[in-house]
Amino acid sequence: MDILKSEILRKRQLVEDRNLLVENKKYFKRSELARKEEEAYYERCGYKIQPKEDDQKPLTSSNPVLELELAEEKLPMTLSRQEVIRRLRERGEPIRLFGETDYDAFQRLRKIEILTPEVNKGLRNDLKAALDKIDQQYLNEIVGGQEPGEEDTQNDLKVHEENTTIEELEALGESLGKGDDHKDMDIITKFLKFLLGVWAKELNAREDYVKRSVQGKLNSATQKQTESYLRPLFRKLRKRNLPADIKESITDIIKFMLQREYVKANDAYLQMAIGNAPWPIGVTMVGIHARTGREKIFSKHVAHVLNDETQRKYIQGLKRLMTICQKHFPTDPSKCVEYNAL
């Protein structure tokens, strides 16, 4: 009994020492006791407790909506009405609310872009963007006007001048796949840019009314899209960091194209793009134990077209250049893919 009384007395003395009980109150919060004990522990250990300044900060620093409402009168309208409509439609928002002005719609778009950033930017329609760019070029020509007799070249596609011929490239192709990776990458880059230039020259040589037709604009947009798709591949080739398995497959494709063996080039392309296992790698790990197919998955059996969007794009661009190469540098029908299909 004496032990219990002494323990009660010790607890009461501890509460009095911590100054937890306020006047006219017979209870205290346990969180306050824990905080006092923590402060006493830090003092014994020699730590300095810094006062919290959370209460001194204004509420506007953590409220972006309030900040936008305070600053919206100061921001001028920096986008055209057409651009505001396009961005609102991309996000599935109405282009105008009831009683809303153009400036109000611009402010609403600005709030949406800040509060809900765009997460599916990689899923844009690249072909439509290229078509819009070509339409804008023709519109600029109409607005700017053109003198009679002036040569219409401002809407022509950009041509990569490689200062080489197909005969020189065919001679270089004899050394492909001989073990010199840097030389192989240089030949691949030169040949692909040569094909892009051949394609652009063909499109630039069309009549003006053909360029302005729907099919003509589509062909020009396809060439622009292919060029943009191949930029990551050219960057990897220039920096010498192209994956070894893809580099080996592209080397085989280019070698067969220079030999005008288009059927073999198409087989090598399918081997690279789809492989012998056209499914993701996780399929072999469905059960508790790995299946036997797991042992057979290596570089030639992986579907590279499924890896990421960038690889899918430049693999698709490579296939388009294979078609252009077959069209401009034909061979025997038995060595062609879909002969006269273009």
Curated annotation (Swiss-Prot):
Record Pfam families = Prp18, PRP4
Q: Where, subcellularly, is it found?
A: Nucleus speckle
Q: SUPFAM superfamilies from the xrefs?
A: Functional domain of the splicing factor Prp18, PRP4-like
Write down the Gene3D superfamilies for this protein, in alphabetical order: Functional domain of the splicing factor Prp18, Pre-mRNA processing factor 4 domain
Function of the molecule = Participates in the second step of pre-mRNA splicing.
| Quaternary structure, from the entry | Heterodimer with PPIH. Interacts with PRPF4 and with the spliceosome. Part of a complex containing U4/U6 snRNPs.
Recorded family membership: Belongs to the PRP18 family.
Specify the protein name.
Answer: Pre-mRNA-splicing factor 18
Q: Which organism is it from?
A: Mus musculus
